[in-house]
Amino acid sequence: MPSTFESQLFFSRPFLSKRQIQRAQKNTISDYRNYNQKKLAVFKFLSDLCVQLKFPRKTLETAVYFYQRYHLFNRFETEVCYTVATSCLTLGCKEVETIKKTNDICTLSLRLRNVVKINTDILENFKKRVFQIELRILESCSFDYRVNNYVHIDEYVIKIGRELSFDYKLCNLAWVIAYDALKLETILVIPQHSIALAILKIAYELLDNKNWSSKRYSLFETDEKSVNEAYFDIVNFYINSFDMCDLQRHLPADLLPIGVERFMELKKNAGPESGLPQIPDHLLNADPYITITRDNNVQERRYVLSLELINGESSINSSTRHA
């Protein structure tokens, strides 16, 4: 009887549509409200870690991206979410080259969670769990380093703002908004430069500027649909969850207070919501990438960045079967 070798091949998809994300989460998240509440708590936890370890915001952004990608393909469990978050941060440090000893990160992580007596055994056991989760995080991203390897949202805000000759006041406001944007799943949907443009547009309008030009989008290799998707995500967040935002607590000193009414006005002036086209149900439910629960007992899983490799292997397998 011939032996069989089970193998899976995945094509990297660093960005997914909202409906694809929701479909993937059906397999991993039983209570989305609980997940979202805990995600905001984890975001604060990661922010506190980054502040105390003096990490730049790009490290936080990378860790948050990893955390949300992880839970697309791995079950959300309340009791281990802070361990997952710590693992995301240690991996994020390597990704964006903000190097810090794992001991320092793990020790501070335990302290922030009120672990009183941190001895060598507790620290080493925690580090083992953190390292074990790293592989799952990398697999959830298909080992694709392109997303977090280059320029990040806050950096794009400054670079694009300077390119468009926006003043310090506008860019500073946009930089604060960019922090709140990290709390959303938008970073799983839209590339960083498109999110940065949407944030600049919001800051531009909050300062009562008129006639924002969509002609700018082609200059920065994006399009109106992508920018609108991020724009409405962020505006809706401020309308629906203004009490959870950091903008109201960190508003630049030279600006008048901004309330939820201001964002409702922006949405009204923007007209009907628009954004990226959504995938129909029949295609969504036929997509194994998001519908099939990942089996960690499979003997081999491989990840590629090019469809040509998948098509080439399919052709070889087909030829072998018919030989």
Curated annotation (Swiss-Prot):
Which Gene3D superfamilies does the UniProt record give?
Cyclin-like
Entry PTM? Phosphorylated. Ubiquitinated. Phosphorylation and ubiquitination lead to degradation in growth-related way by the ubiquitin-proteasome pathway. Neither phosphorylation nor degradation requires association with CTK1.
Q: What does the UniProt keyword field contain? A: Cyclin, DNA damage, mRNA processing, Nucleus, Phosphoprotein, Transcription, Ubl conjugation
Task: State the Pfam families in the record.
Answer: Cyclin_N
**GO process annotations (BP):** DNA damage response; mRNA 3'-end processing; positive regulation of DNA-templated transcription, elongation; positive regulation of transcription by RNA polymerase I; positive regulation of transcription by RNA polymerase II; positive regulation of translational fidelity
An MF annotation (GO) of this entry: cyclin-dependent protein serine/threonine kinase regulator activity
InterPro entries in the cross-refs: Cyclin-like_dom, Cyclin-like_sf, Cyclin/Ssn8, Cyclin_N
> What are the cysteine partners in each disulfide bond?
none
SMART domains in UniProt: CYCLIN (SM00385)
A GO-annotated cellular component: cyclin/CDK positive transcription elongation factor complex
Would I find Transcription among this entry's keywords? Answer: yes
Kindly give any further remark recorded in the entry: Present with 1590 molecules/cell in log phase SD medium.
- Describe the task this protein carries out: Cyclin subunit of the CTDK-I complex, which hyperphosphorylates the C-terminal heptapeptide repeat domain (CTD) of the largest RNA polymerase II subunit. CTDK-I phosphorylates 'Ser-5' if the CTD substrate is not phosphorylated at 'Ser-5', but will phosphorylate 'Ser-2' of a CTD substrate if 'Ser-5' is already phosphorylated. CTDK-I is also more reactive toward substrates that are prephosphorylated at 'Ser-2' or 'Ser-5' compared with an unphosphorylated CTD substrate, therefore efficiently creating doubly phosphorylated CTD repeats.
Assembly and oligomerization = CTDK-I consists of three subunits, CTK1, CTK2 and CTK3 (also called alpha, beta and gamma). Interacts with CTK1. Heterodimerization with CTK3 is required to protect this subunit from degradation.
What protein name is recorded for this chain? CTD kinase subunit beta
- Which organism encodes this protein? Saccharomyces cerevisiae (strain ATCC 204508 / S288c) (Baker's yeast)
Supply the gene name: CTK2
